[in-house]
UniProtKB/Swiss-Prot annotation:
Record's protein name: Ribosome-recycling factor
Phylogenetic placement of the source organism: Bacteria, Pseudomonadati, Pseudomonadota, Betaproteobacteria, Burkholderiales
GO MF terms held by the record: ribosomal large subunit binding
GO CC, alphabetical: cytosol
Alphabetical list of InterPro entries matching this protein: Ribosome_recyc_fac, Ribosome_recyc_fac_dom, RRF_sf
One of the GO biological process terms: cytoplasmic translational termination
Organism the protein comes from: Polaromonas sp. (strain JS666 / ATCC BAA-500)
Compartments where located: Cytoplasm
Length: 186
């Protein structure tokens, strides 16, 4: 393995950690409706549990309401029950074939609780990035130990790895700040 491969591997894995964090942020409810909120809700479809998006069209009616249109007539009640039974705290209402999912207003206490969750998730993402930095630096040191690179090259590689780390940690901080702002907006 060369220094270039170690750096590319580190950057790629750091990007994956940040992408995973972005994905986990979409599951945290803000005051606004987001169709991605229902991605974690599964419904019984002929004996197997599948995401709602595989049995219905999920879209926004307005800023505070998600609409779910089942593709099969008999799925409406099952989808409504699955949303109600999920831990999202949502109360769907069926109107013919359409299921409306209004987003309840969040209390100040719930908002503060969610910002703590967002910060904790952000901290986990930063720890993951730092662990990847450590692994990459160890890989570079191993190359130095095997005399495959010079000390100058090792130092340069560690500096570049640190720049990757700083960039991804700044991105995580930016995502956390944006999500907190979304949550605290009334």
């Amino acid at each position: 393995m060369s220094i270039v491969e170690v750096k590319q591997n580190a950057e790629q894995k750091m990007q994956q950690s940040v992408d995973s964090f972005k994905n986990s942020l979409t599951k945290i409810r803000t005051g606004r409706a987001n169709p991605g909120l229902l991605d974690t809700v599964h419904v019984d479809y002929y004996g197997s549990m599948v995401p709602i998006s595989q049995v219905a069209n999920v879209s926004l009616l307005d800023a505070r309401t998600i609409s779910v249109s089942p593709w099969e007539k008999g799925m409406g009640a099952k989808i409504e029950k699955a949303i109600r039974d999920s831990d999202l705290g949502l109360n769907p209402a069926a109107q013919g074939d359409l299921i409306r999912v209004p987003m309840p207003a969040m209390t100040e206490e719930r908002r503060k609780e969610l910002t703590k969750v967002v910060r904790a998730e952000g901290e986990h993402a930063k720890v993951a990035v730092r662990n990847l930095r450590r692994d990459a630096n160890e890989g570079v040191k191993k190359l130095l130990k095997e005399k495959l690179v010079s000390e100058d090259d090792e130092r340069r590689a560690q500096d570049e790895i640190q720049k990757f780390t700083d960039r991804f940690i700044a991105e995580v901080d930016k995502l956390v700040a944006g999500k907190e702002q979304d949550i605290m907006a009334v």
